Structures are given as C-alpha cells and as structure tokens.
C-alpha cells in the first residue's frame, strides 16, 4: 500500500483492513520469559527445602536397609506440596499482573480516518494511519510528520537525546531525520500529525527490543521488613534446634544401652532421627508461608483494586498506600466531574466571527459527535460553538494558521497567528490575568472585567480570556515576514474579545471521601492551577477547611486562612527554611506550577510524611516520581502514567480513599497471618523442647510438623489474604513507615497464646506419659497431634478478628475463601489421621473422639469471643 504523505483524509475502513493484513498489528512481541520448569526448580533453591532434601535422601538410604519407606515418602510428599503450592500461587500472581500490564496496549490514540478524528486503542493502529499527537502523548508507532507546530520529542529511550526538535522538512544532524518520529518516545512540547510507516516489531524500538525486555524486580519496604523478621526467627529457630538436638542426643547416649555396643548402623539411625528433628525445628521456626501470603495478598488486592478503578502498576503501591499521611491532589477530574461546560461567555468586542475563529483555532481538542477528545476546557468551548450552531471544523478551514504557540502550564496562554478574511491577527487565549495584562483598555472597563472574573472565581468557576491584535501590513508584508509571537506580545496593545466562565461541578462522593481521609489521619492538600478565589471555594466545598477547630499548625498554634492558602508565586519566593515551616500548614495551593508541587512534596517528606500525589500532565511527572506513591489519572498523559505507581481509571478522589483502605487492609491481613503462624511456631517449638526435657518420644513427628507448618499454613495464608477490605481500618491513624510489622499488642498475643497452648498440650503429654506403663502410645500421640491441629484451627478465627473488636462470625458466610480453607484443614486432618498410618504415625479415631476433640478445643474460639465482647463493652461505655 502506498503511503501518501500529503493525505489528510486518513484511511478508509477497507484500507485499514488491507494494511493490517499486510503489516500486522501494532503490538510488540513480549520478552522471553523463564520457562515453567525453571520457575518451578527455583523453588528448590530455598535453603530450608534443600536441608529437607538432604535429610530425605539420607533417610532414603536407611529406608532401603530397613525396608521402611513411609517416613521418607512423607518427607518427599511434604516438600513436593510445599514447592508446588508456592509455585502455583506465585505463577498465578504473575499471570494476573501480566493481564493488568497488558491494559497499556488499550491506551486510546487520536487518529484521522475517513476525514473524522476518532480515538482507537494503540494496538489497532496500522501503517498509513494519520495520528494526532500533542504534549504528553507517547508516540504509538514510527512515522513521518505531516504537520508540526513547535514539536519537541524526548528520544532518550532510543538515542539518549532528551529533547529533539521536529519538523516536516527532515534533515538535521541527529540519529534520525527531523521529520521521523519513533514509537515509545514522548511529546514534550507542541503538537503534530504524522503518517504511520511501521508498527509493532517493525518499529525501531521493536527492533532493539529495549523497552519490551525491561525486567525489574524491586524489593518493597515491606519485603525488607519481613526479610529481617524471617532472619531473626531463623536465628532463634537455629539456636533452639541445635539445643534440642544436643539435649536429645546426650539424653539418649546416657539412657540407651545400645550406645555401649557395636551396632553402628542403629546409632547412625538415632543420630539421623535427631538430625531430622533439628531440621524440622528450623522448618517450624521459619515462616515459609510469608512470601506466599504476601504474593497472594498483593495479587488479590491488585485484582480487586482494578474492579474499584485502581490500576496498580508497581507492587509497592499496594502496601505504601496504607501508610500514606498526606495526599496532594489536583482539582480537575479528581475532585470535579471533568465534564466542563461554558457557564457564561461575555463578549467584549463587536467582531463575533473573529471570536468564533479564535475559539476554533486556538484549540487542540476535537469533537466526535458530542464526545470530546482532548483538553476538557478546550472541548467545552467547542461544544459551546456547536450549541450556537457553528461548525468548528468549517471555522478552522476558513482561517489560515501561520504560526502557533501551544498552551503550557508555565506561560498559561496559547497564541496563534492566523489569516482571517484577508487580515492577519494574533489571537491569544489564556489565564485572565495574563491576557488582560496584554490588553489596552480604559481603567473602568478593566475594573469591570476584574469584578466579573472575581465573582465567577468565588463560585469555583474556571475563567479564561480571549484577546486579539491585528498585524499591520507594515509589520508583515508577506507570510514569510510574519514577526514572532514573542515580538507581538511585547507590544501589549491587544483588544479584549471575551471573558469566559467554565464550570466543572464537584463530584458528589468527594466531600465524604475527603472527610473519610481526614478521619483516618490523612491530610488532604489541593494543588491547582486555578486562581486563589477558585481554589479557596473548591477547598471549602470539599471540606479541607471544614472544621476550624482542626486548623492547628505545625507549631501547635491556630492557623489562619491566609496561612493555609498560598499561591505558586508566593511558594517559590519562600526560602527552603520558610517553605519547610509552612509546608504542613498549607491546605490549598493556587496558581501552582509543576515545580511548586514537586517542592511541596519534598518539604512534606522532610517532615517525615508519606506522600501520595495525583497528576495528569507531562509536567506532573517529576512530582509523581518524587512522591512515595504517584497516582496518575486514567485520562492523563502517557508521561504521567509512566511516572506513576497507580492509575485512577475513573480519575476520582474516592478511588484514592479506597486505595488507602485497600493498603491498610492488606497490611492488617499480613499481620493476621503472622499472628496465626507465629503462634503455631511458638507452641511447636516449646512442645519439642519440653518433650526433650522430660525425655519422651518426639511429641510431633517430622511429617506431622511439615503438615502443620508447610501445608496448613499455606491454607491459612490463602484464607487470611483473601479476607475483604474493611472500612474499620479508616478509623485508625496512619502507621509510620518504619513501624515494625509486629506491634506490642501482637507480640503479647503471640506469646500469650503460644505459651497457653503449650501449657495445655504439655500437660496433656505428661498425663499420657504417666498414665501409660510403656510411655505414650500411638493412639495417644494421634489424639495429641489432632488436638494440636484443632487448637490452631480455632485460632484461625481469632486471627481473622485481629485488630478488631468484632465477632469472628461477622460476614462469615461472605468469606468464601475462609470457609473453603477451614473445610480443607478439617478434611486434610481426617485423611491424615485415618489413612496416614506409619508415614504420619497415626491411627484412626472414633467419631466420639473427633467430637470430643473438636468441642474441647473450640474453647480457644469462645475465649477469644468473650474477650472481644468485653472490649466492645468498654468502647460502648467510653462513648
């Protein structure tokens, strides 16, 4: 298919089909992934698994001599299950993450097809398409420019050049001609149109496979903390296991006459048994279920957060959102509905046609029927033209654009030199204070305009002004001699055309969400480009000034409204020391530029705050990078999304509050799992040590402990990780990022429960030891083992209610994961007891014995329920 570079109509549907068949889809081949077998074998690199395998092979050698393979088979089965279950869940989490990252290929791109501008997913672009790009867009495919207006591209992903000037003429001394633009580069300034020349793997980025093969693996703060915890527990477990090994072996040498003989094989077997016990103690001490619990929690949270309009791009964002203390939010789209409409337009000049042309050409937005594509403010103006029965496309066709300076947040205006009805004009649209400063007008008219603007701004309306200046024939004898826009602006003799008030209503759920965040101890700060009056009104409407009693500054004094508000210009003028002092008191920053937002984030972080920032524009990228959690908007630019950790698909502040709840609930669920597993570990360690002291047979065998620790804890991780988020966590104040995951209350609970369970189980062991003539028999040890498992079974209910005074049965029927796990543990224990035999050192129990054990051990749950009811009563009396 020939590509006509001068073609502005775009492809027809038939041409699109032909191009896709010939050149393929605009999708990069995914990077080579590690095979499933390698991923699975990686699970066997775990030091604990390797120790178990060594023990299992030694046991296997002895089993061949003794012809008793049951324990060996039990160990191999336990290792296989532990590695396979871990592999399955990690693989499942990876698949879920791949599904989420694939959504980036759905990113909308503006193209012209059949003469109309429309949005299509990035992967639907074909060779020959005419693509429209502007500031903040990621170039979706390779192509050659048709139209270029002050276009600057960041080609650092390919050439290392951060800024490259682009035009339609080509040439230049760069790595690529100036009229060539490449996939995955970023538009930093201006706008343009290009015809696609290569898609997918045929693009330059596809050839070098640079971006597509990036594989990053960053350890999150929580992982680092849990690594320390696992290391500490491993050391304790190692000391205990060595001590138990020595005590058991010395006791056996002193009491067993076989050590005086020459049966070296029997002696080796005894040493192996105690070695296996020592290894098992290490296995018991190390919380192997932790990585799985984290993986599960993150994977489940990511999937559920997607349903609540939070697309998590970086895993650490899940956990960090739970520790956020300050949210710096934009106004447009996040706090408002992002459905802008012209509320009022006051003409200040008689030339209505010139105003219509100014609105049409001083804009990068497009309309697809009534659907707006592009900047919401500019879209509102085009919709206003349509409501006046005027076609913006026809107006653009009537005017010949000679030069154009795109809108930027730094300059706060857009300017276009155009020829209209044979005359040349400089047409300016922008912030009223900038545009009015360019205009030549009587003071009374200027004051009237300022009063009108002030009235609108106090109603939280966005205001714009339009002005023009006729370019005299003496200034421009020909098109080539058109002076620069900067030269014309310096004259300051413009004529004011119109003042415009654009309204964007506050989202209905935002005030409640802000209140919820403040109740949760999170400060909300509004950082907006609007005027001080507009920003203050927005702040009042959403409730950041809601309770004057709470307006206490960082120094403990009441802060006035003046101290809580600041403009970007005032903020820039402050020294670092002054800015540091004021940062915490600021509630609203108006007329803010991206650099102001970044500086505010930096100062808040110096105070030790954990900061989340929203941003939708390219210039927000530095602040999004700087923040602990960068939150881009679904409607934002590609650059902003690239810099962010999470994307708010619906742009709403309510989604930020939800993300905080998810983050805190995730942390709480991990604490619940830790509580459950460490209680099991403490109880088992004390039992084995206690058994060594009184000289009885090991109360729990290697295979029994492996079942409890590797398999049952895996089920517990699944149950507790799948618990839904709770709004209760929003009643707490934010945790410090440095806080240890096991707080004082948890540590007390772990030790209390662990010691209490040990006392009960140890008393049972001594009773059985003294009652029987030949020590504890297999039947009694089976009852002992089942009692131990059932105590942990009921304690899972207490773990579910950790950090809450609510009953463990609240929403029980909705917790399907919990019900499934409880059923699996019960069925698994029954199968082991009934059919485990020599492998698990068990004999079948009668129905009566099962009922007695289940009933007696349920006291663990009922004591917990009484304690929670007592705490509820205390809270009720306090309130």
Task: State what each model feature region is.
Residues 749-764, 790:
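Alpha-helical transmembrane segments of multi-pass integral membrane proteins
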Residues 1-734, 739-742, 755, 770, ...:
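Conserved cytosolic headpiece of P-type ATPases
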Residues 712, 757-758, 782-797:
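Generic alpha-helical transmembrane segments
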Residues 777-781:
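Transmembrane alpha-helix entry/boundary detector in multi-pass membrane proteins
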Residues 766, 771-772, 776:
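Long hydrophobic segments that form regular secondary structure
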